[in-house]
Structure formats: C-alpha cells, structure tokens
C-alpha cells in the first residue's frame, strides 16, 4: 500500500465547494460539475480534436490539459475531470485495443481462459507518464478549481475484455463469471492492480479527487455484485485511501446496488436519474455524500423544463442531507450527451449556483 508521504505534492484547496461537500463541510455554494463535460457537446472540443484519434488524444499532455480546461472556462463548473478514457491504462499496458468511432472500445483478443488472464500485461507507472504530465499541467492551470482523476472499475474493464467490445447483455461476461469463478476472480484481481496503479499515478501527480466508473455494474443482481465484484472494487478504494482525497463511486442503473457500492469504501456515491436522491440516501446509509442526478436528456427539453428539474434535484439533494447524506454534489445521472446545447449546460450551472 502506498504511503501518504508519496502524495504530499497536492494543492491545498480549503475553499473548494466540491471538496467541502464531499467531506461533510458546508460549501460556499452548491457544487456542480458534469460527467463528460469535456467532449463533443463543445465546438471548441470538436475543433481541437479534428483528425486526432481518441486514444492518441489521451496520451498528448498538452491536448489533455486544453480539453480538460474547456468546460471550466465555458461553464464555471466547480471541478475539472481529467480528459481520458477508461481503457487508457489497458492500452498503455500493451493490450491490443482501439476506440472505434460509433462503436467504442474494441479488443482484438478477448479473454476466454485462465491462460489469457495470466498473459495480460501489467501496467507500470512509466507507461502512463503522459497522463501524469497532463495532471501536473492542469494543477498549474486550474488555480483553485479541483481536478478529478478517474479510472474504470475492474468489472467494467473486464466486461470489455471478455466481450471484446461494448455489450447490451454482457452474456459472455456473466457466463465466465458463473461458470469459471477462479478465472473470473483472477481477471478482476489483475484489473484491480491496473486500476490501482493508474489511480495512484494520477494521485501522485496531484489530482484532488478520484472517481471509479463502474459503468456496467447495473447489469448485475445485488447478490452477483457482492460475490463477484465488490471485493475487487473495495480493494481499489482501500489502496488509494492513503492519498486522503474524496473517492467517488459511480455506475449506471445501480439503484439496487447503492448500498453495496457505498460499502466498497467510497466517500461519495454517484446516483443515476432513475432514483430520487433522498431515496438513494436511505439505501447508501449515513456518512456518505451523494452525487447526481439530473437526467442528461432533460438538457434537450428547453429552459422551463431545465429550470424545474434542476430545482427538483437540488431540493432532493437537500432532503438527502436531512436523511443522513453528508453532502450533495450536483451532476447528471450519466454523461453529457454529444448533441447537448452547451448554453443549456451553462444555464444549468448558473441556476445550481443560485440555489
């Protein structure tokens, strides 16, 4: 386990609203940021990414810095999130994969056996040195705005490696999980090592919080999540605890898993739009902050609807705090959709800050 001394270069941001809300202190304003806030919804992003592949972009420190900064400048959000992708550490380690436009990550040689797991390359920090350099650039550029680092959770990474790409039903993943638990746990153990290395690299470079994305965990029953996934996510959170920064845990469609996801060790639990925040607070239990949970599609519905729904989410966040949550960070229930009008995002941020 990495000691706290290795994280000593981090900025001190005592007044950052996001960090206050995440740790049970009273923020100076209601903090808000959006998953995928740096991306295709911004014309400046589309311009700077023209002709440059996604993975190539993720390994260019100056480009990562600029893309990460774009929504902070435009929207006045309370955090930047590192521009990257959950498969970046897999690519860096040497796994043969690519991000195909309109499809997503595609893996050349899907995992099928314990021998395949044993052959997986292990990430070392030097292979993600470009990401660490981008973090260092950003901590200089951001001033008093926190930087959130992130990684994919072992289960979601495993799903890509077993399926060979995105999957609606995750049938190959679940088949391996149930039919060959030994291989499954070996795979998730290996991926947990990769995730820990990637997060620790970002933390040592200076990120102020981290988010673990378990994008596909909602495909699982609670019993399967507890048996096959929770121990590995729990180890990830434990191994980065010494950094002393807020740890956020998020998945889509995880309303029935929220209690278990909270048990994994995060300080903040992300909630998608399918469950009210005050209900989520009861499932997560006291002592955690909540993050969420405006439906991303609401941003297409016009100013009156956005105004109403933002106010509703903020009120539910307040009730969640009354129900035992230690704070609320306003966010979407998933990522910003590519065709979202950026002015709708800016307006939503202004409204959140006024409440």
Swiss-Prot record:
List residues binding substrate. 36-40, 85, 160, 215, 334
Enzyme Commission code(s) on record = 4.1.1.37
Q: Which InterPro entries match?
A: UROD/MetE-like_sf, Uroporphyrinogen_deCO2ase_HemE, Uroporphyrinogen_deCOase
Q: Which Pfam families match?
A: URO-D
Task: Identify which top EC class this enzyme belongs to.
Answer: lyase
At the top level, the lineage of the source is Bacteria
Q: Which GO terms describe its cellular component?
A: cytosol
Show which residues constitute the signal peptide: none
Fetch the SUPFAM superfamilies from UniProt. Answer: UROD/MetE-like
Q: Enumerate the Gene Ontology biological process terms.
A: protoporphyrinogen IX biosynthetic process
Q: Which CDD domains match?
A: URO-D (cd00717)
| Record flagged with keyword Cytoplasm | yes
Q: In which pathway does it act?
A: Porphyrin-containing compound metabolism; protoporphyrin-IX biosynthesis; coproporphyrinogen-III from 5-aminolevulinate: step 4/4
**Reactions it catalyzes:** uroporphyrinogen III + 4 H(+) = coproporphyrinogen III + 4 CO2
Q: What's the stated role of this polypeptide?
A: Catalyzes the decarboxylation of four acetate groups of uroporphyrinogen-III to yield coproporphyrinogen-III.
List the PANTHER family. Answer: METHYLTETRAHYDROFOLATE:HOMOCYSTEINE METHYLTRANSFERASE RELATED, UROPORPHYRINOGEN DECARBOXYLASE
Q: How does it assemble?
A: Homodimer.
Q: Which HAMAP family does this one have?
A: URO_D
The name of this protein is Uroporphyrinogen decarboxylase
Q: Which organism is it from?
A: Rhodococcus erythropolis (strain PR4 / NBRC 100887)
The root-end lineage is: Bacteria, Bacillati, Actinomycetota, Actinomycetes, Mycobacteriales
């Amino acid at each position: 386990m990495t000691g706290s001394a290795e994280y000593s270069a981090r900025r001190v941001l005592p007044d950052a609203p996001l960090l206050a809300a995440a740790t049970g202190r009273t923020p100076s304003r209601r903090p808000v940021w959006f998953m995928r806030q740096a991306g295709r919804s911004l014309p400046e992003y589309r311009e700077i990414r023209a002709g440059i592949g996604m993975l190539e972009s993720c390994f260019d420190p100056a480009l990562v810095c600029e893309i990460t900064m774009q929504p902070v400048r435009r929207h006045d959000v309370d955090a930047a999130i590192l521009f990257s992708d959950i498969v970046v550490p897999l690519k860096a380690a040497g796994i043969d994969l690519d991000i195909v436009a309109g499809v997503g990550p595609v893996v050349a040689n899907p995992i099928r056996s314990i021998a395949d797991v044993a052959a997986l390359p292990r990430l070392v920090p030097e292979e993600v040195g470009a990401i660490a350099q981008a973090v260092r650039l950003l901590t200089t550029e951001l001033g008093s705005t926190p930087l959130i680092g992130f990684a994919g959770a072992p289960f979601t990474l495993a799903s890509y490696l077993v399926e060979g790409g995105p999957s609606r039903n995750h049938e190959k993943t679940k088949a391996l999980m149930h039919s060959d638990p030994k291989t499954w746990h070996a795979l998730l153990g290996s991926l947990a090592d990769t995730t820990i290395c990637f997060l620790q690299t970002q933390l040592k470079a200076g990120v102020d919080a981290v988010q673990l994305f378990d994008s596909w965990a909602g495909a699982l029953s609670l019993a399967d999540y507890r048996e096959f996934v929770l121990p590995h996510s729990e180890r990830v959170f434990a191994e980065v605890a010494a950094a002393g920064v807020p740890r956020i845990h998020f998945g889509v469609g995880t309303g029935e898993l929220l209690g278990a996801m909270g048990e994994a060790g995060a300080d903040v639990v992300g909630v998608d739009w399918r469950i009210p925040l005050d209900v989520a607070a009861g499932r997560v239990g006291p002592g955690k902050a909540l993050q969420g949970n405006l439906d991303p599609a609401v941003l297409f519905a016009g100013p009156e609807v956005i105004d109403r729904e933002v106010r509703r989410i903020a009120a539910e966040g307040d009730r969640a705090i009354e129900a035992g949550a230690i704070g609320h960070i306003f966010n979407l229930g998933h990522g910003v959709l590519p065709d979202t009008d950026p002015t709708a995002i800016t307006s939503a941020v202004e409204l959140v800050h006024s409440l």
